[in-house]
């Protein structure tokens, strides 16, 4: 039995915690709010995030991070990107006190605004400055709602150490979620982060009533943008043809379970961003990630017109119809160009 500390009692953190408990591991779940911790402990539900679903009753929750991290072998992070650094700082303080060096698994998908750093880079800054070997990223086409119902799912675990990725693979895998390993944590993180931006665009097209041709074109050209940024960051181009690339892009751009898609859909129907985000009730990672992506594109002169248009619509007041016209009137060129 492995002792796992899951940080973040949102939908994905709760589902992963329950799944790991199903696998026979001891799981403690950190919740930011006492009311959620109490509900999980008393009723084994988390109704604010997941309706009609019950957690494995062996999962226990607490707002005391020191208690949650006590004697843990693995720390699973499932908190918003905007909170990842502050949570990492708190984790480091606890680890300094107890002297443990657990594996760090990130299920967070995003790029930090301001620093433009990926999550494992933040872990290196705040927790393990000597290297990346004990850090693993978990990413792929995996909506919490489907995994909660034990729908068949495949996910990637990536680390600079394939041996450590394989150790996590054995801990996480079961008969309804299959995990694959990768030695490209950079590419896997970029795929998981930037697909959220493309999903907002996919939702906008759906909200405007565009059909299958437009959706397919958007996802394909969106994948080209993701690959372009990933390679610039040091990722391997073939990673983006896998689960954390095209796989995650497909599920996020085509499902009503996607918060980013739902955000875009409402924008396409004419609702302002502030109203959409207020009504969502959960974090829309793509709306934050696009800020970092836009700055990265400008800094490195990367051609990412879809991402740039989403940024302009969200934060510069650009009109959606005007951005679509600009997109379709761009200079003609070859399809394949990294």
From Swiss-Prot:
Keyword set includes Cytoplasm: yes
Keywords from the named record: Cytoplasm, Lipid biosynthesis, Lipid metabolism, NAD, NADP, Nucleotide-binding, Oxidoreductase, Phospholipid biosynthesis, Phospholipid metabolism
Pathway connected to this protein: Membrane lipid metabolism; glycerophospholipid metabolism
Catalytic reaction(s) noted: sn-glycerol 3-phosphate + NAD(+) = dihydroxyacetone phosphate + NADH + H(+); sn-glycerol 3-phosphate + NADP(+) = dihydroxyacetone phosphate + NADPH + H(+)
Keyword Lipid biosynthesis set for record: yes
Active site feature: 195
Principal cellular location given in the protein's record: cytoplasm
A GO term for molecular function: glycerol-3-phosphate dehydrogenase [NAD(P)+] activity
Family affiliation: Belongs to the NAD-dependent glycerol-3-phosphate dehydrogenase family.
Name of the protein: Glycerol-3-phosphate dehydrogenase [NAD(P)+] 1
Gene: gpsA1
């Amino acid at each position: 039995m492995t002792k796992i500390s899951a940080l973040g009692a949102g939908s994905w953190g709760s589902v992963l915690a329950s799944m790991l408990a199903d696998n026979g591991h001891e799981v403690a779940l950190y919740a930011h709010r006492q009311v959620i911790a109490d509900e999980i402990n008393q009723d084994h539900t988390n109704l604010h995030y997941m309706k009609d679903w019950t957690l494995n009753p062996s999962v226990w929750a607490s707002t005391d991070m020191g208690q949650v991290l006590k004697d843990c072998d693995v720390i699973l992070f499932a908190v918003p990107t905007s909170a990842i650094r502050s949570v990492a700082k708190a984790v480091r303080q606890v680890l300094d006190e107890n002297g443990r060096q657990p594996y760090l698994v990130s299920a967070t998908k995003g790029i930090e605004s301001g620093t433009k750093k990926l999550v494992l880079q933040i872990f290196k800054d705040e927790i393990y400055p000597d290297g990346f070997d004990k850090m693993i990223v978990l990413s792929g086409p995996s909506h919490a709602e489907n995994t909660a119902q034990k729908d068949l799912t495949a996910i990637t675990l990536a680390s600079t150490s394939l041996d450590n990725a394989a150790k996590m693979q054995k801990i996480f895998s079961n008969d309804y979620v299959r995990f694959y390993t990768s030695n490209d944590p950079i590419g896997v993180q970029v795929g998981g982060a930037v697909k959220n931006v493309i999903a907002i665009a996919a939702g906008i097209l759906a909200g405007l009533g565009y059909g299958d041709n437009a959706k397919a074109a958007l996802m394909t050209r969106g994948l080209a943008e993701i690959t372009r940024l990933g390679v610039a960051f040091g990722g391997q181009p073939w990673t983006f043809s896998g689960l954390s690339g095209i796989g995650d892009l497909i599920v996020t751009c085509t499902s009503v379970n996607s918060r980013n898609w739902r955000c875009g859909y409402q924008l396409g129907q004419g609702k302002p961003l502030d109203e959409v985000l207020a009504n969502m009730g959960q974090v829309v990672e793509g709306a934050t990630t696009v800020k970092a992506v836009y700055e990265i594109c400008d800094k490195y002169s990367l051609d990412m017109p879809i991402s740039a248009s989403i940024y302009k619509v969200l934060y510069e007041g650009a009109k959606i119809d005007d951005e679509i016209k600009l997109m379709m009137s761009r200079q003609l060129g070859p399809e394949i160009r990294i």
